[in-house]
Amino acid sequence: MPRPEKEAVVNELTDKLSSAKSLVLTDYKGLDVATITELRAKLREAGVEYRVVKNTLARIAAKKAEIEEINEVLVGPTAIAFGIEDAVSPAKVLVDFAKEHEELEIKGGVLNGEVIDDEKIKSLAKIPPREELLAKAFAGMKAPLTGFVNVLQGNIRNLVNVLNQIKDQKDE
């Protein structure tokens, strides 16, 4: 690759490393083209970009993005999954895919600027999706209000019942 092309690749990688909410670095050695294509499709569905990188260019980009700690895992064939919109999606898709295809090795990653190992990535993959967490939080906030409304309605309902009974007694 000529030097200007390398500089463009490094600049693009630096932007993605800086802007991504999470990164997952993998070793794809042993996977055939069809399997990698299947993996890319699953990642694309989840809104994740998956890119094979040259380690030397990735090291330069990591230095510019101030996350040089990932240099330790930039050994051998490396591909990076960039979680731009969601921090959990790359981990979830890759961990699930690695269960089916043992050749895919998760090397490590970055979450909100902090380097994490493969075990933390596996823990991250167990977190429910953002929408589910928000739904649980709102349900938790709604429950006390619903209970309070029911208590208020219960008193009003009891008052109406008492008044109806008094009316019925007077009618007789």
UniProtKB/Swiss-Prot annotation:
GO cellular component annotations, sorted alphabetically? ribonucleoprotein complex; ribosome
The family database entries (InterPro entries) matched by this protein are listed as: Ribosomal_uL10 (IPR001790), Ribosomal_uL10-like_sf (IPR043141), Ribosomal_uL10_bac (IPR022973), Ribosomal_uL10_bac_type (IPR047865)
Alphabetical list of Pfam families matching this protein: Ribosomal_L10
- State the UniProt keywords alphabetically: Ribonucleoprotein, Ribosomal protein, RNA-binding, rRNA-binding
Q: Does the keyword Ribonucleoprotein apply?
A: yes
Q: Which GO terms describe its molecular function?
A: large ribosomal subunit rRNA binding
What Gene Ontology biological process does one annotation of this record name? translation
Complex and partners: Part of the ribosomal stalk of the 50S ribosomal subunit. The N-terminus interacts with L11 and the large rRNA to form the base of the stalk. The C-terminus forms an elongated spine to which L12 dimers bind in a sequential fashion forming a multimeric L10(L12)X complex.
**Record NCBIfam families:** PRK00099.1-1
| Assigned protein family | Belongs to the universal ribosomal protein uL10 family.
Job of this protein: Forms part of the ribosomal stalk, playing a central role in the interaction of the ribosome with GTP-bound translation factors.
Its name, as the record gives it, is: Large ribosomal subunit protein uL10
